[in-house]
Regions:
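Short His-Asn-centered micro-motif
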Residues: 25, 107, 133-135
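Metal-dependent phosphoesterase core characteristic of DEDDh/y 3'-5' exonuclease domains
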Residues: 2-6, 15, 20, 55-99, ...
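A short alpha/beta connector and helix-capping loop motif
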Residues: 35-63
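Ser/Thr-centric signal marking residues that sit
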Residues: 27-30, 48, 97
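Hydrophobic alpha-helical segments with strong N-terminal bias
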Residues: 10, 43-45, 50, 82, ...
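N-terminal accessory regions of nucleic-acid-interacting proteins
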Residues: 1-42
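Metal-dependent phosphoesterase signature
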Residues: 95-116
Length: 214
């Protein structure tokens, strides 16, 4: 892949210069969608089970890159999260994410998963850790979840960067969804699209390729 803006690649590397590990995160959340074919008028009469401002995290996929080993993936984990506003997943959500009702029914709360994530990340934090996601949605969703649950935000205290922004800056291209960006780079997509751990893993592979480019 040809790097169109090497100055932006250098800026990305400089941003990460003082950290050893980069955490690649992808969330899945409760959601619903209008049935296909509805007119705008019909959509007004159709009640969604989950509105956009009611979405809650149900999966946290996390992949750790070691920047001292060429941005190699050195660890990964996923956690399901039990939603509280809309505890029953919609058929649309289950079809999109392949997450089953039993997965979230048996999961911890947002705050319990936050604590588990903190414990998992402790060894990496000791040597320097930042986190990234594809876009700003994940950071905003975690903040909304924390406010709703009256608890500390997941990944609180860690600096965040938007990998999607760095991708389009480095390539001087239009902003893309994650899977098209991965495949445009020449990487074969691995796993299920819209599953947190699979998306995080593919994000980690792409970010590693970007950092090693040029």
């Amino acid at each position: 892949m040809q790097i169109k803006k090497p100055q932006h690649l250098q800026a990305f590397r400089e941003l990460l210069a003082d950290t050893r590990y980069l955490l690649c995160v992808d969330l899945e959340a409760t959601c619903d969608e209008y049935p296909a074919g509805l007119t705008d008028e019909q959509k007004l009469e159709h009640k969604l089970a989950v509105h956009r401002d009611e979405m809650e995290t149900i999966e946290v996929g996390a992949v750790v890159l070691d920047l001292h080993q060429g941005a190699k993936i050195v660890s990964e984990h996923t956690w399901f999260v039990r939603p509280v506003l809309n505890p029953v997943l919609t058929d649309f959500c289950k079809g999109l994410t392949t997450i089953d009702q039993v997965d979230v029914d048996s999961a911890g709360t947002y705050d319990q998963v936050r604590q588990a994530l903190d414990d998992y990340l402790a060894p990496f934090k000791a040597e320097g850790l930042m986190w990234c996601s594809w876009g700003d949605y994940d950071a905003k969703q975690l903040a909304m979840d924390a406010e709703r649950n009256s608890c500390e935000r997941m990944l609180s205290g860690l600096a965040h960067t938007n990998a999607k922004k760095w991708h389009w800056k480095v390539l001087n291209c239009r902003a893309m969804a994650l899977r098209p960006a991965v495949e445009d780079w020449g990487i074969e997509w691995s796993g299920q699209y819209h599953r947190g751990i699979d998306d995080a893993r593919n994000l980690g592979v792409l970010v590693g390729e970007i950092l090693r480019a040029g």
